[in-house]
């Protein structure tokens, strides 16, 4: 699955993370040093999974507006063969594959759990979800996993995003992250991408779930119906295409392999919008009427918070490919909420490690005021302070993502004059960075 790019492994033990092997590439120098001998300070700018992607660069017409900006996102070194399969579903994806693998794996895991339970009812197959990601016979695609189930075995699905190995809360104990960097054309430079494997399979759950139902006993009792709740509109719409492609590809390939419960998996499209609308609520209501058994989504942690109770209390499984808020780890979800995206405790350490590794001694964090922004900002700040930066040199500033003007919050960064600024946001990040560039604290060279 790896393509030879730099890879690091970080192990998680409780709340601590330990770097086991450093990646190459010679990026240990401080990118925040002054440029060309000038006394003017070049501030390092970092992003996160909500904004680091080529769609951010499309908001800028001036060359070099994002040059040198770095960021982290849950990302696997996807094989070219898998990317080609995604591009057949959506040729317009280009080089944007954020959460495509996680979306694909969420569907496959759901289908395998349904096959193990021989039921399309989420309250019946939900207890099997964690167990198909660890402990059994290794398999890397739906068909080979189904062959194991058909013979009475338990599959250990190692999907396109890695070993997975879900922990008790229904989330990965191991995850892959990408460290990304924008070039002078305001696009991500794939040659500068580095991958980090984070976590420890020893933290996976130990209970593999109930014994499998007799294979074939669920045939003819109803098809597995999956609804999408992914961002086709709103502030995260740039993540929609790769996620939709991942879900669509998975359903297509499952059905090509014979489907589940003796029938093709049925896929129902659906938009999540964002928190400025009630689109997610409307989509969930529509999915309930359609009789879906599982919902893939939402992408935004804040959007998920608006509908998770409705979904899980209705006995529908909810499986997010992109939620990262730590709050879902302990959320009361009736055992029906799962995610292939790793929690913020992992991304916060990865980004803090990058920031300190590059020599930054003071950091400003600009984060949208919501479940996603405040949670990730706090994790990053905690990790920076644990790395030796004092509270007085790590400042968090929260903003309204629906604001029409971001001058005030950017001015706080100007006044702070830090070595590094982290922007935690979605589509509005482009407007914030534009103001940062105008005020001399952005990534523009």
Segments (PLM) and residue ranges:
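Extracytosolic ligand-binding ectodomains
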Residues: 2-9, 13-14, 20, 24-445
């Amino acid at each position: 699955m790896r393509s030879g790019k730099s890879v690091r492994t970080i192990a998680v033990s409780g709340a601590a993370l330990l770097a086991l092997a450093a990646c190459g590439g010679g990026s240990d120098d401080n990118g925040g040093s002054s440029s060309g001998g000038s006394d003017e300070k070049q501030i390092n700018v970092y992003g996160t999974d909500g904004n680091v992607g080529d769609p951010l660069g499309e908001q800028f017409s001036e060359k070099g507006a994002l040059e040198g900006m770095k960021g982290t996102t849950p990302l696997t070194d996807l094989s070219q063969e898998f990317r080609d399969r995604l591009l057949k579903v959506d040729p317009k994806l280009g080089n944007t594959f954020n959460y495509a693998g996680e979306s694909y794996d969420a569907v496959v895991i759901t289908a395998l759990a349904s096959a193990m339970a021989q039921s399309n009812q989420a309250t019946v197959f939900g207890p099997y979800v964690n167990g198909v990601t660890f402990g059994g016979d290794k398999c890397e695609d739906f068909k080979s996993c189904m062959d194991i189930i058909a013979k009475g075995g338990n599959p250990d699905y190692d999907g396109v995003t890695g070993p997975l190995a879900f922990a008790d809360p229904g989330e990965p104990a191991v995850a892959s992250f990408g460290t990304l960097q924008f070039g002078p054309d305001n696009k991500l430079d794939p040659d500068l991408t580095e991958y980090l494997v984070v976590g420890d399979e020893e933290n996976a759950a130990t209970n593999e779930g109930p014994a499998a139902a007799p294979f074939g006993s669920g045939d003819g009792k109803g098809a597995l119906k999956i609804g999408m709740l992914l961002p086709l509109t709103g502030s995260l719409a740039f993540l929609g295409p790769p996620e939709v492609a991942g879900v669509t590809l998975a359903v297509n390939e499952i059905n090509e392999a014979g489907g589940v419960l003796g029938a093709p998996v049925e896929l129902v499209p659906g938009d999540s919008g964002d928190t400025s609308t009630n689109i997610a609520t409307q989509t969930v209501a529509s999915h309930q009427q359609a009789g879906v058994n599982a919902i893939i989504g939402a992408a935004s942690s804040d959007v998920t918070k608006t509908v998770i109770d409705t979904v899980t209390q209705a006995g529908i499984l909810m499986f997010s490919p992109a939620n990262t808020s730590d709050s879902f780890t302990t959320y009361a979800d009736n055992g029906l909420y799962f995610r292939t995206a790793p929690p913020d405790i992992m991304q916060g350490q990865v980004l803090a490690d990058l920031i300190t590794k590059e020599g930054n001694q003071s950091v400003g964090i600009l984060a949208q005021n919501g479940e996603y922004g405040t949670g990730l900002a706090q994790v990053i700040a905690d990790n920076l302070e644990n790395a030796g930066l004092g509270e007085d040199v790590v400042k968090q500033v929260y903003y309204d993502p629906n604001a029409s003007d971001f001058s005030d919050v950017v001015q706080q960064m100007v006044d702070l004059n830090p070595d590094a600024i982290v922007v935690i946001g979605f589509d509005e990040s482009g407007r914030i960075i534009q103001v940062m560039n105008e005020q001399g604290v952005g990534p523009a060279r």
